[in-house]
UniProtKB/Swiss-Prot annotation:
NCBIfam families associated with the record: ruvC (TIGR00228)
Underlying gene: ruvC
Organism: Polynucleobacter necessarius subsp. necessarius (strain STIR1)
Cofactor-binding details, from the entry: Binds 2 Mg(2+) ion per subunit.
GO cellular component annotations of the record: cytoplasm; Holliday junction resolvase complex
Matches recorded under InterPro entries: RNaseH-like_sf, RNaseH_sf, X-over_junc_endoDNase_Mg_BS, X-over_junc_endoDNase_RuvC
Cofactor(s) named in the record: Mg(2+)
Family to which this protein belongs: Belongs to the RuvC family.
UniProt record, GO biological process: DNA recombination; DNA repair
Described function: The RuvA-RuvB-RuvC complex processes Holliday junction (HJ) DNA during genetic recombination and DNA repair. Endonuclease that resolves HJ intermediates. Cleaves cruciform DNA by making single-stranded nicks across the HJ at symmetrical positions within the homologous arms, yielding a 5'-phosphate and a 3'-hydroxyl group; requires a central core of homology in the junction. The consensus cleavage sequence is 5'-(A/T)TT(C/G)-3'. Cleavage occurs on the 3'-side of the TT dinucleotide at the point of strand exchange.
Superkingdom of this protein's organism: Bacteria
Active site: 7, 64, 136
Protein name: Crossover junction endodeoxyribonuclease RuvC
C-alpha cells in the first residue's frame, strides 16, 4: 500500500511517500511544497499537493494534527493550511488519518519528546536512506510510517467488545 504523510506548515509543507508491504517500508519520494505569498498561500498549497498526488498516486493519507501554539493567529493560519491539505486529499478520495506530533515521535523514535534530529535519523534508518531528508520532509515521512504501522494493528475492540444478545 502506498501512503503519503503530510506535515503542514504556514510557508513550507512537507510530504513523504512510502510503499508498505507487510513490515517492509520502501521510500518512494519526499519533499516540500513552498507557498510563499500570503495572499496566494492556500491556493499554492492545494495546487502543489494535487500535483504530488497525481504524480505518486498514494492509496492512503495521514496528516499531523494541529498543536495549540502560543500565538492564536499562527494556530489559525496553520489550521487554514491543514484545511487546504485535507481538501486536496479528500478531492482524490483518499482516506485521511490524523496523528499528533507526540504519537508520531513515539512511533518513530520511541519517545514523544524526541528532537527533530532524532526523528530524522530514525526515518533515515527505517527507510534505509543514505542521508536524512530535511526536517519538513522527514516529519512527513514519519507521519506516513506512523500511519502505516497503526493501520496494521488489528482493531481488537471492534471484535471483542461487540455486545451480545441476551438469551431469554
Amino acid at each position: 500500500m502506498r501512503w503519503i504523510g503530510i506535515d503542514p506548515g504556514l510557508c513550507t509543507t512537507g510530504f513523504g511517500i512510502i510503499d508498505v508491504d507487510g513490515q517492509k517500508l520502501t521510500y518512494v519520494a519526499s519533499g516540500t511544497i513552498e507557498s510563499g505569498d500570503p495572499a496566494k498561500r492556500l491556493g499554492a498549497l492545494y495546487a502543489g499537493l494535487k500535483e504530488v498526488l497525481e504524480t505518486y498516486r498514494p492509496e492512503s493519507a495521514a496528516i499531523e494534527e494541529v498543536f495549540l501554539n502560543v500565538n492564536p493567529r499562527s494556530t489559525l493560519m496553520l489550521g487554514q493550511a491543514r484545511g487546504a491539505v485535507i481538501a486536496a486529499l479528500v478531492s482524490e478520495k483518499l482516506p485521511v488519518a490524523e496523528y499528533s506530533a507526540l504519537r508520531v515521535k513515539q512511533a518513530i523514535v520511541g519517545t514523544g519528546r524526541a528532537a527533530k534530529p532524532q526523528v530524522q535519523e530514525m526515518v533515515k534508518r527505517l527507510l534505509r536512506l543514505n542521508r536524512a531528508p530535511g526536517t519538513d520532509a522527514s516529519d512527513a515521512l514519519g507521519v506516513a510510517i506512523c500511519a502505516a504501522h497503526h493501520a496494521q494493528i488489528p482493531n481488537v475492540f471492534s471484535t471483542t467488545l461487540t455486545p451480545k444478545k441476551r438469551s431469554k
